[in-house]
């Protein structure tokens, strides 16, 4: 008897702004390739692997006909890639609406832990620039300690699942900057500060502070 099993599939979320809204800091061409190519690819990749996993669970595939480690590792990569990119789009705002400095509880925590926003920005930037290869620079709220923690994820295989309380995230894969900044990743990191959506970051933090 065939089991009636189906995993719900993922969908590509809409961009929260027009495709050219982050110019001149992040070009229209980069957003087009990044969103419609790479992010969409993670969604499609995850859904394809979920369909294969369905066949494994149902018993449609016999042992030796599939590589469970490969399926799960592929799901880890593609699902995290999808979720992290969704967060990345959300924490940027069009030119003129992003950048500057945070306010509210986020500013208070930054000042308490790092002394000033400028010092925090320096440490985050140095962290981003020190990342070997590809991955993400991340600011997350540690619900255990109450700290705003800066860390990096190499590739999409980070030690924590993507649902940790991420407040701010910077994509450092080459597809995020190479068309515009070539091999000058540090220039991209510096430009990114001009489109950071601090209002969105504050809302994310408030969600975790009130739990």
Curated annotation (Swiss-Prot):
Cofactor dependence: Fe cation
Subunit structure: Homotetramer.
Root EC class: oxidoreductase
Organism: Saccharolobus solfataricus (strain ATCC 35092 / DSM 1617 / JCM 11322 / P2)
Chain ranges passing through the membrane: none
Gene Ontology, cellular component aspect: cytoplasm
Binding site for Fe cation: 34, 85, 171, 175
Cell location: Cytoplasm
One example GO MF annotation: metal ion binding
Highest taxon of source: Archaea
Pfam families on file: Sod_Fe_C, Sod_Fe_N
Reactions catalysed, as given in the entry: 2 superoxide + 2 H(+) = H2O2 + O2
The entry's keywords: Cytoplasm, Iron, Metal-binding, Oxidoreductase
Name of the protein in question: Superoxide dismutase [Fe]
Function: Destroys superoxide anion radicals which are normally produced within the cells and which are toxic to biological systems.
């Amino acid at each position: 008897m065939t089991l009636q099993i189906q995993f719900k599939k993922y969908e590509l979320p809409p961009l929260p702004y027009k495709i050219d809204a982050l110019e001149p800091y992040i070009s229209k061409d980069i957003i087009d390739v990044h969103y419609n190519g790479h992010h969409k690819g993670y969604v499609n990749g995850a859904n394809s692997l979920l369909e294969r996993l369905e066949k494994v669970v149902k018993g449609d595939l016999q042992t030796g006909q599939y590589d469970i480690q490969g399926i799960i590792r592929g799901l880890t990569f593609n699902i995290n890639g999808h979720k992290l990119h969704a967060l990345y789009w959300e924490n940027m705002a069009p030119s003129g609406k992003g950048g500057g400095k945070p306010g509210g509880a986020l500013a208070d925590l930054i000042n308490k832990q790092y002394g000033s926003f400028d010092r925090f920005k320096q440490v985050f930037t140095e962290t981003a620039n020190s990342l070997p290869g590809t991955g993400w620079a991340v600011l997350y709220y540690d619900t255990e300690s109450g700290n705003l923690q800066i860390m990096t994820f190499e590739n999409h295989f980070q030690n924590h699942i993507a649902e940790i309380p991420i407040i701010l995230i910077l994509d450092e894969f080459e597809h995020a900057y190479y068309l515009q900044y070539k091999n000058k990743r540090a220039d991209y990191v510096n430009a990114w500060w001009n489109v950071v959506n601090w209002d969105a970051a504050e809302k994310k933090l408030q969600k975790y502070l009130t739990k």
